[in-house]
Amino acid sequence: LDYTIDDMTEASVFEGKKAVYFTLGCKLNFAETSTIGRLLKEMGVRTVRAGERADICVVNTCSVTEVADHKCRQAIHKLVRQHPGAFVVVTGCYAQLKPEQVSAIDGVDLVLGAEQKGDILRYLEERLPLLPAERKLADAEHEAYTVPTKDIHTFVPSCSCGDRTRYFLKVQDGCDYYCTYCTIPYARGRSRNGSIASLVRQAEQAALEGGREIVLTGVNIGDFGKTTGESFLDLVKALDRVEGIARYRISSIEPNLLTEEVLAYCAESRAFMPHFHIPLQSGSDEVLKLMRRRYTTKFFAEKISRVKELIPDAFIGVDVIVGTRGETEECFEEAFEFIRSLDVSQLHVFSYSERPGTMALKIEHSVSPEEKHRRSQRLLELSDAKWEAFYRRYIGTEAEVLLEKSRTEGVMHGFTANYIRVELPVEENLDNQIVRVRLGDFNVDRSALRATLL
């Protein structure tokens, strides 16, 4: 099973149809949606333009929090209203975890779980020719195709272009960690991956299409290699050799899997950028234990110090969950002080959300929504201060920036190797080019540093 077009697939069913795509959640979901889009395009389906009605709606869902579930339902209702009569397919984590809930939503024609989404063309080919009335009859039977978590085995490849400069290459899927707050292992199955040879081919193809930067995505990418007997370090070395790709970023890697060898290689690498995203989740050892995370605060602090020792300019983003069960006021204060002490550049702060079926529900102490909000705000303020301090260190320095067109009139944006966002007056011929600049002060909305070309 693969995201590929079977020779038997009947193109006439798809010819001239228009599709709309809606994605919620992580970079991995966005990569998978655009791969589905590419498949349908090859079958003659084009993306709708503003104001047009679609024949096919594809919704790729997220279920990381209760809010995510709610947003998914809202998005489906909205698309059904905007595109009456369209064939509506829902896939992704919410579809895998709650297929009955999703198929019961008015207007949904087909629900595909994690193991089925790679086969979307076959499912559509069988059902698209049906008249809306016949589809409604099928709807009454709730057409949902999923398998139990233990039977999710397929690695569905995906390399997609988020914009013209940056590609997202899916290297791994699933997770074997079963942290107590998280439903992702149930939604995406066991850890599995593509082969290094197949991933190198996809990177080479991205380079041929003009891609300059690739972000490696997955659920637990440091765990790469379980299915193929390879390692994440082997993958990094192989991708570093692909001609035409100037930059790689590692989307997120567990602290215990960011090994000394991987760090040392990235420090000397041709194309792996000094930019890491490392989930911490809590700065309290007591809470880390309740979460079943695989490290202590001491280990985490040493890892951050080691990154900075080997790669002093590295941008380090850190995930933190606030208000989990068991996070008492004392635990939070301890966590806050620990996080303040870390030399990191930005915090990604999430409020804890109760997920049905997770082990965290057995923990007695719970935190009120108001208290969660207060803790979030304190961490967000800390994040802003760390982010600004990191940017300020580079004002007046020279840097290489990969430029991309901006939605803002008259300017272009891009990122330095160490992920500082940069703003320049627009010059069309510089789109998707790497240029040398001098970094100046903050722009008007303080979202980037102004820069001048050298």
Question: What feature does the model see in each segment?
Answer:
Residues 1-223, 237, 261, 276, ...:
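Proteins enriched for Cys/Gly/acidic motifs involved in redox and nucleic-acid/cofactor modification
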Residues 68-70, 190-195, 225-230, 290-293, ...:
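Short, solvent-exposed loop/turn segments at secondary-structure boundaries
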Residues 278, 319, 339, 347, ...:
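Hydrophobic, well-ordered secondary-structure elements that form the walls
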Residues 162-165, 175-176, 272, 282, ...:
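Short flexible coil/turn linkers enriched for glycine and charged/polar residues
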Residues 345, 358-362:
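Short glycine-rich, low-complexity segments
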Residues 4, 362-454:
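Terminal RNA-binding accessory module
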Residues 88-89, 97-98, 208-330:
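Conserved SAM/AdoMet-binding glycine-rich loop
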Residues 327, 342-344:
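Contiguous mid-protein beta-loop-alpha structural module that forms a pocket-lining wall or clamp
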